Amino acid sequence: MAKQKIRIRLKAFDHSLLDQSALKIVETAKTTGAKVAGPVPLPTEKDIVTILRAPHKYKDAREQFEIRTHKRLIDIISPSPKTVDALMRLDLPAGVDIEIKL
């Protein structure tokens, strides 16, 4: 797997959980001898939803809710087969979405 790169994008609503997962991935890749670039923080997405508080009229009474999606990017440069094996066996929390590109 010479001259290849693995790009890992992580998404989560909880930034502390996301940082812990990114740290696990970086440590695992470094122990197998691969070069690691990151974790790079990507822009946070904010989804804002506005709803009416009252059931009938009173359009001025509104409430806003938001959910933030935090993202991180990790590049693993020149991974070995041991690196790929270790990443496949890695156990990460359920609240983290992982997208891997080779």
Swiss-Prot record:
GO molecular function, one term: structural constituent of ribosome
InterPro entries for the chain: Ribosomal_uS10, Ribosomal_uS10_CS, Ribosomal_uS10_dom, Ribosomal_uS10_dom_sf
Gene Ontology CC terms: ribonucleoprotein complex; ribosome
Function according to Swiss-Prot or TrEMBL: Involved in the binding of tRNA to the ribosomes.
NCBIfam families xrefs: PRK00596.1, rpsJ_bact
Pfam families: Ribosomal_S10 (PF00338)
Chain's gene name: rpsJ
Family membership noted in the UniProt record: Belongs to the universal ribosomal protein uS10 family.
Listed name of the protein: Small ribosomal subunit protein uS10
